Amino acid sequence: MEYKHHALIARLVYKDLDKEVKKEFKALGYTTVKFFDIEGAQAYILANKDRITVAFRGTEPKEKSDIFADLEATHTNGFHTGFLEEYEKLQLSVHEEVAKLQGRKQRPVYVTGHSLGAAIASIFCFHYPEAVALYTYGCPRNASWKKAKELKVPHYRVVNNNDIVPKVPPAFFNFAHHGQLRYINYYGNIRELTTWQRIKDSWRGRRRAWQKGQVFDGVYDHLMDAYCECLEDNE
């Protein structure tokens, strides 16, 4: 249930706040909806009487800062420089809002995001270890091997079959994943597979994509709609 719930949120954060979006968040159980848009970086903070959810928006092709962030594959304080810069745009506002909500009533804080938003969500959790769980979808590597070991928040890293984004930046540039991999296989099911099993499953996915005329299978599998479709079938 949590995988699907946070996936729906991670998809919704690509929309700016309006009445319809507020209704969609309400349908997911949230009575408080806050939207932040700072220098091309966006986040939502959602709350109800039982929980707070912090969600970060992923890459938007129209946002030059998003593209530059993705390409800035150097390190700053153990983090991917581009992703860290996007997080820092939102850092003060998001942390202040979470503190304000917690000041009214203490609730568990969940964090989520897709693509670039997943990377920002990860960095947020390094700075907010009180979060109870981090759910990411198509998350790129965002920390050095040493820094990745320092994450205290339970991280459920969902990867859809041949999604290309979790493969970058390359590990040989000293970038690592963290958290527990939750792999969506060729059949659309969440499974824990060995490396060899994932390789075989990856080829099944490519073959299916070619049969459908989908040349860029890794790009299609990265779409948040593809994640939501698979997780809907898992319910």
Briefly describe each language-model feature range:
Residues 1-112, 116-235:
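Non-catalytic, mobile gating and regulatory segments of ester bond hydrolases
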